[in-house]
Amino acid sequence: AGAPVYLAAXXXYLTAEILXLAGNAARDNKKSRIIPRHVQLAVXXXXXLNKLLGNVTIAQGGVLPNI
């Protein structure tokens, strides 16, 4: 078990975490499909993900409401 295994595990965990949060955002918006907007909302809402991916542009993600 080397670096590629650990890298794959970290990428799989990060993907699963983002998809779980995006699924929650889709459900909150009464949608059955995850769209890029839901991914954008999920990343921005989680503090750790926002710190990691805050400067990443998600295509068709839109802007965050600043209320």
UniProtKB/Swiss-Prot annotation:
Q: Which residues carry this modification: N5-methylglutamine?
A: 60
UniProt cross-references to InterPro entries, sorted A to Z: Histone-fold (IPR009072), Histone_H2A (IPR002119), Histone_H2A/H2B/H3 (IPR007125), Histone_H2A_C (IPR032454)
Which keywords belong to this entry? Chromosome, DNA-binding, Methylation, Nucleosome core, Nucleus
Q: Does the keyword Methyltransferase apply?
A: no
Q: Which Pfam families match?
A: Histone, Histone_H2A_C
- What subcellular compartments does it reside in? Nucleus; Chromosome
Tell me where on the tree of life, at the top rank, the source sits.
Eukaryota
GO molecular function (one): DNA binding
- PANTHER family given in the database record: HISTONE H2A
Subunit text: The nucleosome is a histone octamer containing two molecules each of H2A, H2B, H3 and H4 assembled in one H3-H4 heterotetramer and two H2A-H2B heterodimers. The octamer wraps approximately 147 bp of DNA.
Family to which this protein belongs: Belongs to the histone H2A family.
For this entry, the protein name equals Histone H2A
Q: Which organism is it from?
A: Olisthodiscus luteus (Marine phytoflagellate)
Q: Tell me the classification of the organism that encodes this protein.
A: Eukaryota, Sar, Stramenopiles, Ochrophyta, Olisthodiscophyceae
